Amino acid sequence: MSTVGTPQAITVRYSIDAKRSTFTVRAFATGMLSAFAHNPTIAIPDFQGEVSLNPDAVEQSSLRMVIHAASLTVTDDISEKDRREINRKMHEEVLETDSFPDIEYECSRVSGSKIADGQYLVALNGDLTLHAVTRIQSVSARARLNGDMLRATGDFPVRLSDYEIRPITAAGGTIKLKDELKLSFDISARKQE
């Protein structure tokens, strides 16, 4: 059987543009005094990565992303003193950023379907390395191609205990963070030349 004249699917590489993207973590308080605590929103401003996308064969696509853990910062409307203290605890006691500076996600197991011209629903099953522990992390996203730009949106849960991380506690343990965090993203990536 001849393949002459058959169009070949082309994989296109995109570089993630952190400045045009948003990536956040929501943590939720629990415990006897949790009604008096707040549920912090944490911005992830410093990350980079690359997407390889084959629009005609999504399963041949891949993603690699590196987050600089020390860049995570609380964005809530709280006092500067509280912000510094929460950020310090997050970096020193939870993420231990001096020992584990990067959070990495690498995925080459992608499935999905085209839902409209240039729009896809995708499911990624990749390796998330956090706090020197690697686990399979599933992420569902809606991806859209627009000229030289790729945009992906979605959210997914991460359990701290899966990565051997103890949640922060306060007020003698009567307030602590729940084990499960919610990560939300609106990632833009530009086609590489």
Q: What residues fall within each predicted segment?
A:
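Low-complexity, acidic/polar, glycine-enriched regions of mature
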Residues: 1-193
